[in-house]
UniProtKB/Swiss-Prot annotation:
Residues recorded with modification Sulfotyrosine: 23, 162, 164, 167, 194
Signal peptide: 1-18
The record's account of how the chain is modified after translation: Sulfated on tyrosine residue(s).
Name of this protein: Dermatopontin
InterPro entries: Dermatopontin (IPR026645)
Modified residues (Pyrrolidone carboxylic acid): 19
Subunit annotation: Interacts with TGFB1, DCN and collagen.
Annotated Pfam families: DERM
Length: 201
C-alpha cells in the first residue's frame, strides 16, 4: 500500500475507533461505567434502573473474598432504536433466591432494563431480580447465550454487548458453594421490527 494513502486513512480509522470504542456503541454514552461508579458497596443491597427507553448493554463487577465473598456492580444502558418504539410497560420479575443456581428470562417478551439485589450474610450470596420492559408487541428471535462471566469464580467481570441488534433478555447463573461466587451467562436476542401474536417467547 502506498505510504501516502496510509497516512491519509490512518486519522480516519483512529477517529472512527475513538468514536465507537470498538464495541459498536458510542463509548462516551456509557455514563459512570468505570471503577469508581459502583452502584453498591459490598454486602449492601441495591436497585438499578436504566432511564426510560433504555436497556442494559454492559455489566461490570469485582469480587472481594474478604468483604463477605461479595461483588460490587456497575451497569451501562443505551437507548433502544426508534424501530422498537417506546416501552409500553415495565415491571420487576420474580426473585431468584440466594445460594441457588437459577435461569430466568423477562416474561411477556420483555428486555432487561435494570437489576435489584439483596445480600444475605447467612449464605454469603445475593438474591436477584430483573427489571424488565416490554416494547409494544415485539417478539424475540435468534436468541443465544454469552460465554461465562467471569471466566473463573472470583475474577473480575466485564460483559459488553458488542452488537446493537441484540438485547439482554435474562441470564442463567451457576453458584459455587466453595467459592461463594457466581458465573453468569446472559441471554441475548434480536427483536422483531413488527408486532407479533406470541405473548411470551
Amino acid at each position: 500500500m502506498d505510504l501516502t494513502l496510509l497516512w491519509v486513512l490512518l486519522p480516519l480509522v483512529t477517529t472512527a475507533w475513538g468514536q465507537y470504542g470498538g464495541y459498536g456503541y458510542p463509548y462516551q454514552q456509557y455514563q459512570d461505567y468505570g471503577d469508581d461508579g459502583w452502584v453498591n458497596l459490598n454486602r449492601q443491597g441495591f436497585s438499578y434502573q436504566c432511564p426510560h427507553g433504555q436497556v442494559v448493554v454492559a455489566v461490570r463487577s469485582i469480587f472481594s473474598k474478604k468483604e463477605g465473598s461479595d461483588r460490587q456492580w456497575n451497569y451501562a444502558c443505551m437507548p433502544t432504536p426508534q424501530s422498537l418504539g417506546e416501552p409500553t410497560e415495565c415491571w420487576w420479575e420474580e426473585i431468584n433466591r440466594a445460594g441457588m443456581e437459577w435461569y430466568q428470562k423477562c416474561s411477556n417478551n420483555g428486555l432487561v432494563a435494570g437489576f435489584q439485589s439483596r445480600y444475605f450474610e447467612s449464605v454469603l450470596d445475593r438474591e436477584w431480580q430483573f427489571y424488565c420492559c416490554r416494547y409494544s408487541k415485539r417478539c424475540p428471535y435468534s436468541c443465544w447465550m454469552t460465554t461465562e462471566y467471569p471466566s473463573h469464580y472470583g475474577e473480575d467481570m466485564d460483559m459488553i454487548s458488542y452488537d446493537y441488534d441484540f438485547y439482554m433478555r435474562g441470564a442463567t447463573t451457576t453458584f459455587s458453594a466453595v467459592e461463594r461466587d457466581r458465573q453468569w451467562k446472559f441471554i441475548m436476542c434480536r427483536m422483531t421490527d413488527y408486532d407479533c401474536e406470541f405473548e411470551n417467547v
